[in-house]
């Protein structure tokens, strides 16, 4: 698919009028060179307009897709809207409203590190971009098999409720496995996030993998799931059995503690830098939450006495942690950073 350039659509009456007016002006001046330039530029008016809108749910993935579409004609015909937030974590209740957006980013500001204000601004811009998509343009939603992107897919679909646009879904996990899985490597080929794909792979996927064009029943079902999310008071979502689930915040705490004990065995009776734990959990966790969520849960485990810490909890480069099996294992328990 998408290997052949789509033909130019007919001019609107206003465009035709503009062409005629400018051609007459140039003809009167007997400027053949300018006349040719004007004609060519006006005939390309429709060609530079987007013909497909792609909505993605990962900042890094958006960058890779833009790189894949950097050459003509795709550069002009494909519009990319990025909803750059990890929607598997934090509140999403009433996220389609101004108050819901404020509540989400206030919570993120209070619990996670990062430039939350910039994230909020980008999120608001993306929501407005989705709402302003022209009704005649087809939309492709890109998402992998993870809660962050699947939550975004449902939220975007809910924002598009009642719109006449044709919607298709391109599941990057399934597409990648379909195109690249071989008998020899059948168990090794797996991606968790769309951003794991290179621009070259994305271009190949777009050329050779047919997105799933939703029928009315599928669209209504996803819209309803998106609507349900707007009433969901949980702060963590997971993807299991091809479905999105609301989960308790502490769902991954036992796994974090398992990793913490493994690392503690390398430093018996000592502290170690928290980034070692965050990195190990991030690399092994089968759900995508982002590293700042993992640090948030580590701090909660410190707060509840499962882990000890020393140093500045405001900077993850400057504090260390240790496992507390009882209060005598690691000395100098420090909870003053809260």
Task: Identify the residue ranges that each predicted region occupies.
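Short amphipathic alpha-helical interaction segments
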Residues: 287-303
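A conserved mid-domain beta-alpha-beta active-site/ligand-binding segment of alpha/beta enzyme cores
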Residues: 186-268, 272
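A short alpha->loop->secondary-structure connector
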Residues: 73-77, 155-169
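C-terminal engagement modules used by replication, chromatin/transcription, nuclear envelope/ESCRT
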Residues: 300-338
